[in-house]
């Protein structure tokens, strides 16, 4: 069945088998089966095809975490849901997918079948991307990277009355990872960045257009995070605007994150042709 381009097959999972051995042979998790059904249901009858066969896709997602001291760290609200759903949708469409992610705030059953690389800091992320970026056809930079990091590491917990001084003396900006990685982009590769914004798209549009040039990517997807029921989390819905380097923008209306991931990939494939 795997060889049929209009059949979505889920591979057996790894875990404790009936014979008391650990190995591959379990039914995929219910959450993943439900996700696959939602993906299929989002297509019209006989519309589904594995149109990404033989394509390698590299996706980042989730937050990074930068250590302050033994008890504190700098991070953000990203759950890793959008990056994961992009990964599963690309896999459902036939691609070979690698998902590089920070700490996930969603059920890890949903990662079943995805080749994953877990990272923690921005340095970890850059190292992983440098190892993998040259082989991919598409790169989705969906990770929410911490804006700041601490330059001096400490294994102790800093007293509260000293924390302000420590931060003021040791804060530095994290380099723009997408901008850095884009310098090694090949002509046949497609790089997609992501940008969260608040307020109206009219207010954010100029900044977004500047970012796509600064970051050196082919497309930048911008989505609002200050609207009720949208933004962070697996169950949240989303909408957004896909910008390209020709000042064109393509709106994807408010929908579930898996449907959004599917429509976004479809839009990028169609624009690349």
Residue ranges of model-derived segments:
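Positively charged, low-complexity intrinsically disordered leader regions
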Residues: 26, 41-56, 205
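Internal gly/pro-rich beta-alpha loop/helix module
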Residues: 1-44
């Amino acid at each position: 069945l795997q060889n049929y381009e209009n059949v979505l097959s889920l591979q057996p999972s790894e875990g404790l088998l009936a014979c008391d051995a650990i190995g591959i042979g379990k039914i995929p998790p219910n959450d993943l089966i439900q996700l696959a059904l939602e993906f299929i249901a989002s297509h019209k009858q006989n519309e589904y095809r594995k149109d990404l066969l033989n394509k390698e896709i590299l996706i980042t997602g989730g937050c990074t975490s930068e250590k302050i001291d033994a008890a504190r760290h700098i991070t953000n609200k990203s759950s890793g849901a959008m990056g994961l759903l992009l990964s599963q949708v690309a896999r459902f469409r036939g691609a070979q997918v690698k998902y590089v992610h920070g700490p996930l705030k969603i059920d890890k059953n949903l990662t079943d079948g995805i080749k994953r690389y877990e990272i923690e800091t921005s340095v970890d992320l850059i190292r992983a991307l440098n190892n993998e970026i040259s082989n991919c056809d598409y790169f989705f930079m969906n990770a929410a990277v911490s804006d700041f990091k601490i330059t001096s590491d400490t294994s102790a917990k800093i007293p509260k009355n000293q924390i302000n001084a420590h931060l003021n003396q040791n804060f530095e900006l994290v380099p723009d990872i997408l901008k850095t990685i884009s310098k090694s982009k090949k002509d046949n590769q497609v790089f997609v960045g992501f940008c969260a914004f608040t307020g109206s798209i009219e207010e954010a549009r100029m900044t977004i257009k500047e970012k796509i040039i600064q970051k050196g990517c082919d497309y930048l997807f911008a989505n609002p995070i200050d609207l009720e029921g949208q933004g962070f989390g697996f169950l949240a819905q989303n909408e957004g605007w896909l910008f390209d380097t020709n000042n064109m923008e393509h709106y994807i209306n408010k929908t579930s994150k898996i449907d959004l991931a599917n429509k976004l990939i479809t839009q990028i494939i169609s624009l690349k042709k």
